[in-house]
Regions:
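Aromatic/hydrophobic pocket-lining residues that form π-stacking "cages" and hydrophobic walls in ligand
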Residues: 15, 77, 157
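Active-site catalytic microenvironments for nucleophilic, acid-base chemistry
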Residues: 18-22, 80, 198-205
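ATP-dependent carboxylate-amine ligase catalytic core
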Residues: 21-105, 123, 129, 151
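Nucleotide phosphate-binding/pyrophosphate-handling subdomain across enzymes
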Residues: 88-93, 100-111, 115-116, 129, ...
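Internal gly/pro-rich beta-alpha loop/helix module
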Residues: 108-109, 121-200
Length: 240
């Protein structure tokens, strides 16, 4: 589960790509979508087929007709991943952590990307309020990983980790392959380092293959449409 304010989608994408580079079948759930809701649910980088969407949607609606939009999509994604028999599910949280739909599922690791001011009307007016809510995504005995945080936010994470008996691992100084990244911007190294930290732990726990050169290829292959994406000029239109 990927929780935070900035870089959740990028970190989720990096983790998915690194796992796929090592031969795993990966389900990736992100939000919001850019063009179509189908983008939110991907299996090995491919959107859920259009003909499967209504079939699975009907099953979710029949089982739980009163879900919110995000809860519905979360349930649909989990159902799609279960049917596909994926090896790893990467779930990006939608809003906060305490009551987010992705927190309802059991997880093997929780990642915290940089936490900042967002959704103040729902999560609270201060960074402490926001970080406290997001920190509640931690589960007892489940390791948590965090990117560098503002002091206020880190204090909240450390306090919740102690209360829940969770080991919180700070990733700023952990080993990281020196490779090109598929996502643009110097800030992406923070997200990639977090993804590598949780991948190293998961690979060790499951005895998955884990080679630095393969991880580097995975990081370089990352692509997230609409996020600092460069589109070349075509049909008389300028590049974007």
């Amino acid at each position: 589960q990927i929780v935070g304010t900035n870089g959740k989608g990028s970190t989720s994408t990096f983790l998915s790509c690194v796992a796929r580079a090592h031969g795993l079948k990966v389900g990736l759930y992100t939000s919001p979508h850019f063009v179509t809701p189908r983008e939110r649910i991907r299996i090995n980088g491919t959107m859920l087929p259009a003909d499967r969407w209504p079939v699975l949607a009907d099953r979710v609606m029949e089982a739980a007709p009163n879900l919110t939009y995000f809860e519905f999509l979360t349930a649909l994604g989990l159902l799609a991943f279960a049917e596909a028999g994926v090896d790893l599910v990467v779930m990006e949280a939608g809003l906060g952590g305490h009551y987010d739909a992705t927190t309802a599922m059991p997880v093997q690791a929780v990642c915290f990307t940089p936490i900042g001011m967002d959704h103040e009307k729902i999560l609270g007016p201060t960074l402490t309020d926001i970080a406290s809510d997001k920190s509640q995504a931690m589960r007892p005995g489940v390791p948590a990983f965090t990117a560098p945080q503002e002091a206020e936010a880190l204090d909240c994470l450390l306090r919740t980790a102690q209360e829940k008996g969770t080991e919180l691992r700070e990733t700023a100084t952990l080993p990281f392959p020196q490779s090109a990244l598929g996502l643009a911007g110097p800030h992406q190294r923070v997200n990639a380092r977090l993804a590598i930290a949780v991948w190293d732990w998961l690979a060790d726990q499951h005895h998955w293959p884990n080679m630095p050169e393969t991880a580097a290829k995975g990081l370089a292959s990352a692509h997230f449409p609409g996020r600092f994406q460069r589109i070349p000029a075509c049909n008389g239109l300028p590049p974007l």
